[in-house]
């Protein structure tokens, strides 16, 4: 019996499917999708601003395009031809530039040779998709042309119909657009979805270019990490986070992402460094990288930003006592005359006791010059259209956790105690644990961008550094100690017990159950904590139910990285190595050929119907069945066109 309360929803659905036949056709299409092998999902993490390496890994589908080409062509291509074809798929513009100055005949020969082989690859990939899905993978402006190329039985280069389709592009010097479209179609069909498990920026050169390239991909989801929420909070004007991201940009010599990428001027900090820190050697603040500014000036700017960060964090901790982070405010524990600081009841000598802007009576107060600097930086962050656009995309495409078939993906940890019991944290006045905590924090982040309440914006700072933040998961962030104290005991950041417990299969099963993932076969996927392979660590934990894919992607931390490949046949881990340059990839055919290891091989191929996407499709089918019932009962009238 049709529930009349459903009618508004069904009436809206009727706009898309105005007849019974239209609804039945869509049901058939959806049921066909359920029977297909599930799409390949690639999961990467902790990119940390390495835009060139990320672009290559996306372009070569984490190394899976090379074996695909080998399977399609067998021994029909020489090694040189295979490299030429792959470079045209990875970098069509740069590859074509090598022949752009040649004669029209040579350009035509290159176009036909490349297109014929790319079309063959597309046809092979199309076998795993419906026709509608294949066409959706084609760039919209070129959809009709690619449809003809892929479906035609004629051969390119033999004259006639297909060559006539291409001829106008050659005449107008636009053949590169065809090559770009086919290359993109291959990449889109090879990887159904890209998931980035957090920490897109900091350390590496350009966060802005990382996000810009991700924004151009067809299907991307982001699981927020603590470095992501720091930039998100800074874009909303959270002052402690503004100081933090500026300090980190200076620490790694990455001012170009601020100044060129986001149009944010650091001139106010430059002025503060030249005045308040004019004679400061700032030896503890040497820049890890190169920049256009004088190295000593950048060190002084970094110190000025660090002191601003510590002051603003102290103000925030006093404003938000519920965070229970008062013990991490250390400026009032400095004895400037003795050159010491008290930490956890023990006194340590300071490596640098020059604090020209510190008032012993009110150490967290900003001087007038500091207040002016913060105000100008804040205005610059709030007025950056590029930063706002990219951070709002991060909110739109982002989440605190994600399920993909049997994989449970989140950046850091589920906060637990030593026994593996879920730890409580109060959000919106209610105690939350486990999945409820993740979901409540996600609502807070979205509300911060929607309404901008200071309480919500401040929560992004806690997510960056708080012990019960699922994105951080350590007892403390020892930034002050690493700058100012030699004793390495004070530098220690103790990880949440979660990171040890994921070696236990039973614990992993409980975590999966908490998030509605298969308790017996679920796989936990994290980033955040770099895998130190040189120390004998493995990304695949002893439980074989958890994998950490922070492989030190950035040059500053190892220049490796992992992609977890979730295929219909199983889960595999691809370990990447150093990427030299686009020029080497095009000129010499250099590639990142990953080392592949199996995480799990499935007994039977996983279908779309076995996954969470299948559950969504089943709900769509149920709604369409209700629409057909409404047409049959006369509750809604069909509207044949």
Swiss-Prot record:
Xref: InterPro entries: FBPtase_class3, Metallo-depent_PP-like
GO biological process: gluconeogenesis
Organism superkingdom: Bacteria
EC number(s) per entry: 3.1.3.11
Protein keywords: Carbohydrate metabolism, Hydrolase, Manganese
Keyword Amino-acid biosynthesis: no
HAMAP family, alphabetized: FBPase_class3
Family of this protein: Belongs to the FBPase class 3 family.
Name of the protein in its database record: Fructose-1,6-bisphosphatase class 3
Organism (species): Sorangium cellulosum (strain So ce56)
């Amino acid at each position: 019996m049709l529930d009349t309360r459903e009618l508004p929803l069904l009436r809206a659905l009727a706009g898309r499917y105005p007849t019974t036949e239209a609804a039945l056709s869509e049901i058939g299409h959806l049921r066909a999708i359920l029977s297909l092998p599930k799409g390949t999902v690639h999961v990467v993490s902790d990119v940390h601003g390495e835009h060139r390496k990320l672009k290559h890994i996306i372009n070569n589908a984490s190394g899976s395009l090379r074996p695909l080409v080998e399977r399609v062509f067998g021994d029909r291509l020489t090694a040189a031809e295979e490299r030429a074809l792959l470079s045209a798929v990875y970098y069509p513009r740069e590859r074509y530039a090598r022949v752009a100055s040649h004669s029209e005949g040579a350009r035509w020969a290159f176009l036909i040779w490349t297109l014929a082989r790319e079309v063959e690859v597309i046809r092979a990939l199309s076998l795993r998709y419906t026709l509608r899905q294949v066409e959706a993978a084609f760039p919209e402006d070129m959809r009709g042309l690619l449809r003809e190329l892929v479906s035609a039985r004629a051969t390119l280069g033999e004259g006639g119909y297909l060559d006539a389709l291409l001829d106008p592009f050659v005449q107008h010097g636009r053949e590169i657009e065809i090559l770009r479209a086919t290359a993109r179609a291959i990449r889109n069909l090879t990887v159904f979805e890209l998931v980035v498990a957090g920490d897109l920026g900091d350390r590496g050169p350009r966060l802005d270019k990382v996000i810009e390239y991700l924004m151009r991909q067809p299907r991307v989801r982001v699981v927020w990490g603590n470095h992501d929420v720091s930039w998100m909070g800074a874009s909303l004007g959270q002052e402690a986070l503004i100081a933090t991201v500026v300090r980190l940009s200076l620490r790694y010599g990455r001012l170009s992402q601020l100044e060129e990428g986001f149009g944010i001027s650091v001139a106010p900090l430059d002025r503060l460094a030249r005045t308040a820190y004019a004679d400061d050697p700032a030896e503890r603040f040497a820049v890890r990288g190169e920049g256009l500014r004088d190295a000593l000036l950048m060190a002084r700017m970094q110190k000025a930003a660090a002191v601003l960060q510590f002051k603003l964090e102290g103000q925030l901790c006093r404003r938000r006592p519920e965070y229970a982070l008062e013990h991490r405010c250390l400026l009032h524990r400095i004895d400037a005359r003795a050159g010491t600081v008290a930490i956890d009841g023990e006194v340590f000598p300071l490596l640098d006791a020059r604090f020209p802007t510190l008032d012993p009576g009110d150490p967290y107060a900003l001087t007038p010059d500091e207040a002016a600097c913060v105000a100008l930086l804040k205005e610059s962050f709030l007025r950056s259209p590029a930063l706002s656009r990219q951070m709002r995309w991060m909110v739109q495409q982002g989440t605190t956790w994600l399920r993909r078939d049997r994989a449970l993906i989140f950046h850091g940890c589920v906060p637990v105690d030593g026994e593996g019991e879920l730890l409580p944290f109060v959000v919106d006045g209610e105690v939350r644990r486990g999945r409820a905590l993740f979901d409540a924090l996600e609502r807070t982040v979205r509300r911060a961008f929607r309404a901008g309440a200071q309480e919500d914006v401040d929560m992004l700072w806690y997510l960056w550094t708080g012990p019960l933040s699922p994105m951080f998961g350590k007892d403390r962030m020892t930034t002050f100690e690493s700058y100012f104290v030699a004793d390495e005991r004070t530098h220690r950041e103790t990880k949440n017990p979660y990171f040890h417990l994921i070696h236990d299969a039973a614990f992993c099963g409980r975590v999966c159950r908490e998030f509605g993932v298969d308790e017996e076969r679920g796989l936990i996927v994290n980033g955040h904590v770099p895998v130190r392979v040189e120390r004998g660590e493995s990304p695949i934990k002893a439980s074989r139910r958890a994998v950490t894919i922070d492989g030190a992607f950035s040059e500053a931390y190892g220049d490796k990285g992992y992609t977890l490949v979730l295929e219909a046949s199983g889960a595999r881990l691809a370990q990447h190595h150093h990427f030299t340059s686009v020029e080497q990839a095009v000129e010499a055919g250099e590639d990142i050929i990953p080392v592949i290891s199996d995480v799990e091989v499935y007994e039977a191929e996983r279908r779309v119907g076995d996954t969470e996407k299948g559950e969504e499709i089943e709900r769509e089918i149920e709604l369409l069945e209700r629409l057909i019932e409404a047409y049959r009962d006369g509750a809604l009238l069909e509207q044949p066109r």
